[in-house]
């Protein structure tokens, strides 16, 4: 991290945090889940989905899943998207909780010597992120 960026983060009054890959090292967990979720359509499709997901981090599953369904020739319906989203959530929750902290995050957030306000900004659905946060140690 450059000196300028370090100064900016250390002395800002408000710090906004993403979750996956910033607080918890959970990006790989979600890559595996997308690949597994669509594995019934074959390795060519599931590998394409994994690659797309990894190149488009931060994009909501609610945007990705309809696209991925279209790649499988599944009829994209609200009910179908919700079914895949629910399955995805079941696949990732515990693995995200169990994933390691990003190195340095806990020390930084624990020090808060400048009395900063910290705000979590994530594409993870509200109920899911709240459940994950409640179960973190």
Please provide the spans of the model-predicted regions.
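Short, acidic loop-to-helix structural element flanking the phosphoryl-transfer center
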Residues: 2-6, 10-11, 90-120, 126, ...
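N-terminal helical cap/lid subdomain that shapes the substrate entry/recognition surface
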Residues: 9-19, 23-103, 114
């Amino acid at each position: 991290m450059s000196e300028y960026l370090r100064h900016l983060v250390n002395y800002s009054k408000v710090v906004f945090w993403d979750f996956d890959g910033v607080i918890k090292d959970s990006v790989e967990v979600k890559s595996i889940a997308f690949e597994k979720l669509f594995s019934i359509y074959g390795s060519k499709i599931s590998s394409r989905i994994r690659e797309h997901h990894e190149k488009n981090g931060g994009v909501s599953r609610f945007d990705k899943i309809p696209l991925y369904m279209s790649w499988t020739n599944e009829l994209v319906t609200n009910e179908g998207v919700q079914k895949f989203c629910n399955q995805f959530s079941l696949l990732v929750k515990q693995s995200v909780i169990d994933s390691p902290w990003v190195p340095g995050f806990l020390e930084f957030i624990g020090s808060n010597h400048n009395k900063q306000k910290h705000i979590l900004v994530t594409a993870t659905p509200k109920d899911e992120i709240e459940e994950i946060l409640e179960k973190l140690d």
